[in-house]
Regions:
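Conserved alpha/beta-domain cores
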Residues: 1-129
Length: 129
């Protein structure tokens, strides 16, 4: 845990230095994919508020232990048919890579009376992803 605290402090210092006091300090998202909930919970005591998971099934398995303690981000590719499972449980969906997915996110968010923030993935060269 001491190593984790030291690494986290170093990262936070680097983020603060990068913002140089002129910009907001970037939000740190601890990527917790593949780690069990019991290994993730101690991060709360270190001040971590946001975690990233890349699989819907993993989010759903860890949800009972983590949802009240962290803001959960979906990082990585999301299939349209799985949006309904996470729409009420994540704070941000990263890597929206196609219009049909954005439309499904919007459809499911409306059903749950919420607006879902997303990050759009674009290819500057027009390459298929």
């Amino acid at each position: 845990m001491e190593n984790l605290q030291a690494n986290l402090t170093l990262i936070q210092q680097r983020l603060a230095a990068a913002s140089d006091g002129k910009y907001p300090v970037p939000k740190l998202i601890a990527v917790t994919k593949t780690h069990p909930a019991e290994d993730i919970l101690p991060l709360q005591n270190l001040g971590v508020t946001d975690i990233g998971e890349n699989k819907v099934q993993e989010i759903m398995e860890k949800l009972p232990a983590l949802e009240k303690n962290f803001r959960i981000h979906l990082i990585g590719r999301l299939q349209s048919n799985k949006v309904k499972y996470i729409i009420d449980h994540v704070c941000l969906i990263h890597s929206v890579d196609r219009l049909s997915l954005a439309q499904e996110i919007d459809r499911q968010a409306q059903k749950h009376n919420r607006v879902m923030p997303v990050l759009i993935q674009v290819s500057p060269c027009g390459e298929a992803q």
